[in-house]
UniProtKB/Swiss-Prot annotation:
This is UPF0502 protein Bphy_5360. Gene3D superfamilies: Winged helix-like DNA-binding domain superfamily/Winged helix DNA-binding domain (1.10.10.10). It comes from the Bacteria. It holds the Pfam family DUF480. It comes from Paraburkholderia phymatum (strain DSM 17167 / CIP 108236 / LMG 21445 / STM815). The lineage of its organism: Bacteria, Pseudomonadati, Pseudomonadota, Betaproteobacteria, Burkholderiales.
Length: 234
């Protein structure tokens, strides 16, 4: 497995705030999903932080709050400000500071933006950041992140009803005692922001399925075959 990290432990960063983690995640995400607009302006960064889809929890933060987070991340060398534009633009420095290869940074980004995820969920969530061959490949990079000094992720105990364990990033500090004990999340109501984030993800997946179904119908028409014929070949 290729890695940009070395054998020496990285200096420990102080725990990030949720907003600082969101800013860092948005910068890495947008670098790979909308490269033409990267580095990001403050306005674009605010839109990414307050995005309703692919975010858990959903946030509603001001540009001044984001700017405070940026200034802190700049002092930690995690964010850099460009000087070649009249409008200030910002880029992440996560791979260099944390000593991570792109694959690991992509997984960490998904955890920063979406909260705890299973390896299978992470493979889907990172599809536009890095294409993992299979879930086993995702798990291998997660295990590497967990073995870093200091560790960057942790594998949470499975909660009742869960088939797979979820992974959580550690950039905002250690998980709570309840998470480590595997307390059943279903016993407590979800916070409004997290519930809205899950609903937004569900809508996003439904829209993606609809687009794929429409594409299949179009391709079937181009090939001159019926959908029943295609189903019979699967």
């Amino acid at each position: 497995m290729n890695s940009t990290s070395d054998d020496n432990p990285r200096p420990a960063l102080r725990a990030l705030t949720p907003l600082e983690a969101r800013v860092l995640g948005v910068l890495f995400e947008k670098q790979h999903t909308v490269p033409d607009t990267y580095p990001l302006s403050l306005n674009s960064l605010a839109a990414g932080c307050n995005q309703k889809t692919s975010r858990s929890p959903v946030m509603n933060v001001s540009e001044s709050e984001i700017l405070d987070a940026i200034n802190t991340l700049k002092r930690l060398s995690l964010v850099l400000e460009g000087s070649s534009s009249r409008v200030p633009r910002y880029e992440h420095n996560i791979e260099r500071v944390l000593g991570l290869p792109r694959q690991s940074a992509a997984l960490l980004t998904a955890l920063l933006l979406r909260g705890p995820q299973t390896a299978a969920e992470l493979r889907l969530a990172t599809s536009r950041l890095h294409s993992f061959a299979d879930t086993s490949s995702v798990e291998a990079f997660l295990e590497e992140l967990a073995g870093n000094d200091p560790p960057r992720v942790v594998k949470l105990p499975r909660t009742p009803g869960e088939r797979e364990s979820r992974w959580m990033h550690l950039l905002c500090g250690e998980p709570s005692a309840e998470q480590l004990r595997g307390a059943a999340l279903s016993d407590e109501p979800l916070p409004p922001g997290e519930l809205e984030g899950l609903r937004a993800q569900q809508r996003e997946l439904s829209e993606r399925v609809e687009r794929l179904e429409a594409l299949v119908v179009h391709l079937a028409g181009e090939l001159g075959v019926s959908l029943d014929d295609l189903k019979g070949r699967l």
